[in-house]
Amino acid sequence: MSEKMYPIPFASLMNWVVTEYAQSGDIFGVHKKYEATGKSLPIFGERIETPFGPAAGPNSQLAQNIIAAYFAGARFFEVKTVQKMDGADLAACVPRPCILAADEGYNQEWSTELTVPQAQDEYIKAWCALKVISKVYGLGDPDGFVFNMSVGYDLEGIKGRKVNSYIDNMMDASRTAQFKECKKVLTELFPAERDFIAHISPRVSRSVTVSTLHGCPPQEIERIASYLLTKKHLHTFVKCNPTILGYKTARSILDSMGYDYIVFDEHHFNEDLQWEDAVPMFERLQKLADKEGLEFGLKLSNTFPVDTTRGELPNDEMYMSGRSLFPLTIEMCNRISRAFGGKMRISFAGGAEYFNCDKLFAAGIWPITVATTILKPGGYNRLLQMVEKVEPMEYRAFAGTDSAAISDLAASARTNYHHLKPIKPLPSRKSTEQVPWLDCFIAPCKGGCPIEQDVPEYLELCRKGLYGPALKLITEKNALPFITGTICAHRCQGKCSRNFYEESVHIRDTKLLAAQKGYNALMASIKLPERVEGKRVAIIGGGPTGIAAAYFCGRAGIETTIFERERKLGGVPRYVIPAFRISDEAIDKDIALMMSYGVEVKCGKSAPSVAELKEMGYTHILLATGAWKAGKLDIEGNVQGVIEWMKKEKKQVKPNLSGNIVVVGAGNTAMDAARVAKRMGAHATILYRRTKKFMPADEHELQLAIDEGVEFIELAAPVKQAKGMLLCDKMVLGEPDETGRRSPVKSGEQFSIPCDLVLSAVGEQVDSDLMAANGIEMERKGPAFETNVEGVYCAGDAHRGPATVVEGIADAARFAEAVIGVPYEYEIPAQAFITESDAIAKHGILKMSGKCEGERCLQCSTVCENCVDSCPNRANVAVVMPDESHQIIHVDKMCNECGNCTQFCPYASEPCHDKFTLFQTAEDMVESKNPGVLFLDGDHVRVRMAEERDYDLTTSDNDLPVDIEALIFTIRDKYSYLFA
């Protein structure tokens, strides 16, 4: 495809609006409709029904973007900046991709990529469309919204013919061809509104926001604002850069909030507008505005320039936005409000979103414009929730800002969960698969789970209070619901799409809830299966993997015996993991579930040899011995393996430790050991070669250790323990490896810390003696983990090395399938599914809690549409097929390859390049490599799949795949407005 987007003619645009609204009640894919209540706020001699709208940027560049935002509740539109450089010249300066909004936002955009006349036409089209749909569809007062121009970047350019004409035409569009065309088209579409349409005001905008480049001298800023106030008589905002805070303040704030990896130097801070120049200039401009009878204020803030250091975007510098910008912007507001005694009007942009918008409004900061939040899943739909949060508050004319409230908000922002960077970066939510052309909706949580639990389905059952069926569904694939509901590494939660909203659904907790509430019913329903003849299974090792394997085999009716050398089953969870993390009762319930299928258990002595087991008639033998052997830490001194130490300490009832214990390593086991040492009376320290960000422990476990007072020493490696001290090498982080982890390198410096005992938690190992004694060669494992000895298998730690519980269950299931000979099949109850409309209703709603976590589940496998929501231009469209399924098509003409949809697609793909594409012209198709369709006429199409061919839709033997043909027919018959 080409990065060149082009505007939709107004007649086609309105045909889309009218047809889609009639068919579905949506407009440009936005599902959440705001209907104004009659309240409004005065501004610029006009009124706005809500204080929200899109900031000058990707969401206010095209007419459809503005209409989509209005439909969801926006009423203040800061349309995208225009300047003397435009069109192809400007687009050539913008790299692709240019937007990265997966977490805090970054972009390399600039002003509009259209020509200035095209941009003007887009804004006039949007203005006229909103005037009519507000009335016809009952969305609000046709005079209840405001368009605010954004112009830059120097006075010469602003006074030049191109931008000057734009300003004049936005102030009075009556003489423009576009305004006349809009009124003509609208009159044809809505003849009953002829008189109303005839009187649509041509005064599209009576206000402006001044945007200047970094390094613009204060004198130039003042000249621009003065010109717009006195010569154009426009209400004026001046946009300020966060650099006005000073380098030390910005660096300190970001570092303290976990954004220490964001790189920037002092040059912008030194070259941009300085505080001592800004305050007197703003005072002069305020007086000038008062003299002219106009409103003046500051737009806080512009995006923040930072270095591109990790290949985030193509150019060397990018502009930061979103949640990391909020603490900087609100600190700017704090200083401005105090400096001007609350009298300076502030228009906000810089990380505003649902969780802070009410506080901003209550402090007198409005209008509030947004960008990053509506570039995320939910997209424009997120605006409605913001509006509904603020609407019950008192609407009153601007009378000043509340300096005390802003100061409190600035202080709290630095510790607020929604603005802090997590200790550890979230893993990628993408799979390794390519997005299919059709039927692409998947639940990333399920794909991220080693056993592919039916997560959305059991969450929905729990939401409905059907805990018995929920647990039954869980145990179709998961033999250990209590253990995994308590200590699972929950990779599913790292993949959860809810992370793009606030935080993941608490999947593990809900699994435990289902286990607790559904256990009795499940146990009562279990019946001994009919015994399978000719197969007997022996499992050596009664830890999680062994229990799971026995469960799966026993459920299939295969005679199964577990051999465990300890007195009880349970392995590491029972004998090593501390009781404050998992109780014996929870472990026992999973064991009872397994034993309900008639599994025999032999505990308290070592298992017979493989040869002996075969002589006893066992046809399949599984080695499921855990990783009990200490990892090697090759230093002198008092060093113990963490597993044996924790096993010993678990037997202690009362605190029995003192002195200084240093745990070397940073996995979950290391966190457990440090917490045990701390609770048992010692001073506990975790020593790690890298930083917290790269620790392998789950963030939750890491945070618990921090909360309990465990000391962390980062960038350090042990050298020698002696005489109560541990000598350490000071490390530095080198270049990232292929996983993104930066390799630790010795700095040449050393230091010592108090230490009486070192615990080695650096990669536990499987005892290879058992393998060797039975002639098993570990490197020769075949399908389903069969070893070089026929009929003998390895699973869990014995197969992978130290493995998580759920990885052990996955191995156990594969082993059981090899024994049984056929895949296990089961049915998901109908109550576990929800409708497409119910799934869509969850989009755009930020929600930290609910009666049940199932309320927060987005049901991605029913309807994903992340690419639809996140596209500012609406270039990814969901079409409803005759069977009511939703399919995604990409509309080439509306896309500028910003790349935003790529961030949120759960596949290793780019929807703008990889989804089936609708082309507008033959030239567009030639310039693209996308798969897709071009309508040549009503019955003939050109389709590109593996190859490009023309097809006749009137013939039944046209060789088009049936599903692709159905999609093409649906586009032609129901969505012709997409290419009209």
Which residues does each PLM region occupy?
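N-terminal capping/small domains of soluble enzymes
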Residues: 1-226, 231
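Glycine/Thr-rich beta-alpha phosphate-binding loop at enzyme active sites
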Residues: 22-37, 242, 246-342, 377-395
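Catalytic cores of alpha/beta
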Residues: 64-68, 352-368
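Glycine-rich phosphate-binding active-site loops on the catalytic face of alpha/beta enzymes
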Residues: 75-85, 242, 359-386
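Ferredoxin-type iron-sulfur electron-transfer modules and their immediate structural context
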Residues: 317, 323, 374-375, 381, ...
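Feature captures the FAD/FMN-dependent oxidoreductase FAD-binding
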Residues: 531, 536-538, 588-635, 720-726, ...
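Rossmann-like dinucleotide/flavin-binding elements
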Residues: 540-561, 602-611, 625-633, 645-699, ...
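Rossmann-like dinucleotide-binding cores of NAD(P)H-dependent redox enzymes
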Residues: 559-562, 566-601, 674-719
